[in-house]
Amino acid sequence: MFGKNTYLHLPQVSSSLHSRAATSVVDLNGNEIQLHDMLSGHYLTTANAPVLESTALFNNNNNFNHDVVNGLNRDPSPTFPTKQAVKKDRHSKIYTSQGPRDRRVRLSIGIARKFFDLQEMLGFDKPSKTLDWLLTKSKTAIKELVQSKSTKSNSSSPCDDCEEVVSVDSENVTDHSKGKSLKANNKCKEAMDSHQAAAKESRAKARARARERTKEKMCIKQLNEAIVLRNHQFEVSGTREAFVHPVFGFHQQNYGNASHENWDQSNLSSQSNQLCAILNQHKFIN
């Protein structure tokens, strides 16, 4: 009478009625009829699966819409991690002191031309044979290189070389700085010596000028003293003549005047001699 789809989706239409079916009583035409949940087992077993799937899809759609609104444009389809294929190197590595090395060697254009020309001249079909031939021919050079490396490593390590270079540089810097300081000190000493010599010379000249001034002052003082002494003698001689009384009259007066004149002349000559001697001495000293 009812289709399968309508029968299955009948509880979805009135979910509240289904929730109340087991516990509530419905009044139909005054008669109390208790509804039994006859479809509960069938709903839980058959109809629950599609409802759960539909709700899961609805939740996924809601999550996708929420991500789009928030700016996260994620793929709603489930993603599975895929393993990237690792490329296998067909060539085996060679382990050296500096780590694994590839057996393949990339040559420049010029070296490749020379190498293949040599290979053609030798008639080898493989490049490894050509390299073997080159290594065998250069054994002596390789031995010399190994010996030189060993002697250098035994004689001095790189740290020692660096320390020696640093010490030499520091010594050169100190010597250069010492040389500069010595030159500066020498210049300062020379300047001080020249200044001191000029000061000494100026002081000596000042002392010489002072001595000349003192000598001139002494000469002038002696001349003034001689003049004062002569005037004093003139005054004394005039007072003595005033108190002399004539004894013999006219002859006595003339004798007195002659003697006075002779005394004055001798006094003046002695003073002039003294002045000449002082002046001559002053000139000789200068």
Curated annotation (Swiss-Prot):
Name the Gene Ontology molecular function terms of this record: DNA-binding transcription factor activity; sequence-specific DNA binding
Q: Name one GO cellular component term.
A: nucleus
Give a GO biological-process term: flower development
Q: Which residues form the R domain?
A: 200-217
A Pfam family matched in the record: TCP
Q: Where is this region: Disordered?
A: 72-100, 193-213
What keywords tag this UniProt record?
Developmental protein, DNA-binding, Nucleus, Transcription, Transcription regulation
Matching entries from InterPro entries are given as: CYC/TB1_R_domain, TF_TCP_subgr, Transcription_factor_TCP
Q: Where in the cell is it found?
A: Nucleus
| Predominant subcellular localization, coarse grouping | nucleus
Q: Does the keyword Methyltransferase apply?
A: no
- Domain TCP spans what residues? 87-145
Q: List the disulfide bonds.
A: none
State the protein's purpose: Involved in the dorsovental asymmetry of flowers. Retards growth rate and reduces organ number in the dorsal region of flowers. Binds specifically to the DNA sequence 5'-GGNCCCNC-3', and is able to bind to the RAD promoter sequence in vivo.
What is the protein name given in its UniProt record? Transcription factor CYCLOIDEA
Q: What is the lineage of its organism?
A: Eukaryota, Viridiplantae, Streptophyta, Embryophyta, Tracheophyta
